[in-house]
Amino acid sequence: MFQQNQQSQNQQAQNLMHIQLNGNTQLGLGALQTINVKPIKLQSRAQSLNPNLRISERNKQTTQTSSNRQNISNKSPNNLQTSKSGGLQTQNANQKLSSSSAPKKISGNFSSRVIYRAKTKNEDEIIKKQSSQTSISTNGQEKKGEIIRFATESQINNENSTPNSKIQLPPIQEKNSYKFYINSQSSNNQVSQDQSPPLQGLQAFNINKNKENQFTKKRHFDFLERTKVKNQSEETDLLKMHRYFRCKVSNLITGSGKKQYYLQYLKDMKDLMTKVKQYERVAKQNLFINDVMNKLKKIVATRAKYKYKEKIDFTRSIIMRTLGYESRQIIQQLKENMALEEQEYEDLEDDADREYEELKKKQEQQALDKNQKKELISSEIIANWKKMRGYQPNQKVFICIGQYTDLKNYLKEQGWIENPNPESLVFDLKWVTKKKDVDKDLLLDQQITNHFQKNHNLTSKNGIALNLRNLIWYDSVDIDTFYPRCFDLSDVQEFEDFIEEFKFTQAESILKQYVENKLVIDQKAKQYEKYLRLKILLACVALKRRTFSIEKKISLISVNTLPIISPEEWSVLNRQDNNYLFLEQNPDVYHRLSQIITREMDSEESNAVDLSKLAQKYLEASKEYDPQYDLNEKNLWIVKPAGLSRGRGIRAFDQLEPLLNYIMGKDVMWVAQKYMENPLTIHKKKFDIRQWVLVTEWNPLTIYFYDTCYIRICFDEYDPSDLQNKFAHLANNCISKHADNFEEKVNDTMMYLEDFVEYIKKIEGKDMFYSKIQKEMMNIAINSIKSCKDSIEPRRNSLELYGYDFMVDQNYNTWLLEINSSPSMEYSTPVTTKLVKMGLEDTAKVIHHHFVEGEKRFNKNIEYGLWKNIYREQK
């Protein structure tokens, strides 16, 4: 039986196909009629395990190959037929296959895999639609095997895929012909390219097959170095690659419709990450496909691991060119004018320089021998220190750096000793404001500290924005329902995602203002009314594309080298309402855009008389699609320095070009976040909620929630038209205290929770805080911390206090703004004077009882003041 299996394998290798079947199977080859097939040798599983057998079989095949190899022409689908027995035949007399080289059955114990070649430009006569199923019978039973044909870029993958294979990789180059492996045993038709013939352009980067194919930072830069744009063709390929990977969670993976729809979609996909792993197994022979998979994983799940970051170069960004933005020229102008704005950004750059200096010093300190460091501190040294000063051996020592008077007082009441030397290594607890003040390499296991390593993944603005996307894998949580979209503008893919999102929200804003009669034509410019109509219809087209299904979006991306909203379309959507001279002076542009509208919209829609009704239709569809629909009105975005706090460097914009001018030429990492344009207000003023959250363990994850909070209110009334007034948009006390007459109105800038609850009851006639807002804050706190569980370094005797900032919209939905490490504990107002004292004392109770007094074993019935346990991970 073993010899029979080997003979059938050798015959199949001579038959121009590379097929492996799982089990004793019969393959009907009739569905492979129009596929260009290139010969490749087959190694059976036995041959791959036995080198001697492999050599002998190679010698046998060498003598047979020249006589048995035949060419198959695929210029016409009529040239190929399927025999009754399932073999492959041709009507061309000069290229007829002999019966010996075309076996009708294949049997053996190996997995099914088929190679066929991508179609070139000249092969445009191929049949557009072919059967996507091949009959495979095993012991008389029928199985279905999927086949995908990558003939041209315009041949869309989902036409030949099963419902379970919704994401397919588009072919990148159509000028070259390559072979593709398709694993028909898989439900998602995994694809990888063969390394023969020699790869070119973006694909000319081979890897060592014996090494794990992990896309490290060094390899990433090597890949970028080898893929520099050398000609227009390669630039097009590179642009396609970037466009395909701009499938961010909100637009493609989780953005296929309402929450219920896409969560069901992910369930049907059997977890996309599993499919990514399946892709990787097939793709180990070629870096390009493996690069596809790694980028997909980065965008969907693990982008927050900073080793994956790809820093953007604005002067070479393709997406900037599509905007018509001359980066080099703008940067030069900004440098020339920097003297005028130098004072405004001096603090930002100084802070960045200090951070770099601190990081450098820390790295130099870490370079010391760890064993040598350990000799500086031990339990015996601490015991001798206590003995020399007359303290009892069981007395605890603490060091506190910062204004934490209430915490110090409570610990002293419990018999703790304060070590006044902040540089000393003798302590049982060290409470500091900055993590750098504690050297983790010098910590004994029993010493307690109030920071975890790598906490920037949770507390930095770019860190939390990226890590929150991990939630789709933990609990299928939709972050768009509680976190305004946020993008890291220093990262290539994030920046491109932001540009596309800005365009979509701009189109949505145009329709909203038109429906509300805020977008009207000047009576003196009635001749431009047709251009306004064009603008409204283009905005409808943009929203239509935004709500495409995942399959259709991938199809659009794979065949189109331009952004989803093209430069010409954006040139109209981005212009001021009454500035239609551009279209009047460029009738060809108007004509092309009119053709796009005719092609992408129904005739009834493109010729609609009532544009308001049409705009309302697309706005309703957008509302169903986007959980953040109500946040947008005038397309306002807020830009923040990623690593700074206390409102430093924050600006709001409603136009793209001023925003880009603001972030360019400054050595600061920026994030752009959607501005909440429908905030709930208190006496016409914006406000946010400061909530304390405490993590005492990461393994198992244990989270406490402080059972009260306080409200921070902006100094001036909310006015979305005045974006330069920080006192109307930022509620930070460090901002408000600089306002005129602050001392007279200081009590108006903060509110107790009890007063806020009563204020809401007067408006709504019922409680909205405890029944809705607080529950949502708890869920957001749990989910945000869970998203960083794999990124933050756990330590048994550490804890950390976080300050969460929330906002509430007019529908009483709660939104996360940011998370602060070492939140301010200053007595800035009467409200904070009372609550800070309570909060620090209760935190000291957690330290004293939970970590010291033998209550390390978790017990949710133990109370630590107002600290309430809301989450305990099950081991």
From Swiss-Prot:
Its main location: other. GO terms for molecular function: ATP binding; protein-glycine ligase activity; protein-glycine ligase activity, initiating. GO terms for biological process: axoneme assembly; cilium assembly; protein polyglycylation. Monoglycylase which modifies alpha- and beta-tubulin, generating side chains of glycine on the gamma-carboxyl groups of specific glutamate residues within the C-terminal tail of alpha- and beta-tubulin. Involved in the side-chain initiation step of the glycylation reaction by adding a single glycine chain to generate monoglycine side chains. Not involved in elongation step of the polyglycylation reaction. Its EC number is 6.3.2.-. It comes from Tetrahymena thermophila (strain SB210). Residues 61-107 have a biased composition (Polar residues). ATP binds at Q673, K674, Y675, M676, K686, D688. The keyword Cytoplasm applies. InterPro entries: TTL/TTLL_fam, TTLL_monoglycylase. Keywords: ATP-binding, Cell projection, Cilium, Cytoplasm, Cytoskeleton, Ligase, Nucleotide-binding. Residues 517-859 form the TTL domain. One of its GO terms (cellular component) is cytoplasm. The keyword ATP-binding applies. It is found in: Cell projection, Cilium; Cytoplasm, Cytoskeleton, Cilium axoneme. Residues 129-138 have a biased composition (Low complexity). Disruption phenotype: Cells lacking TTLL3A and TTLL3B show a strongly reduced level of monoglycylated tubulin and a moderately reduced level of polycylated tubulin. Cells lacking TTLL3A, TTLL3B, TTLL3C, TTLL3D, TTLL3E and TTLL3F display shortened axonemes that are resistant to paclitaxel, indicating that tubulin glycylation changes the lattice properties of axonemal microtubules. Axonemes are however normal at the ultrastructural level. Residues 48-107, 125-144 are annotated as: Disordered. The gene is TTLL3A. Changing E818G: Dominant negative mutant; causes severe defects in axoneme assembly. This is Tubulin glycylase 3A. Gene3D superfamilies: ATP-grasp fold, B domain.
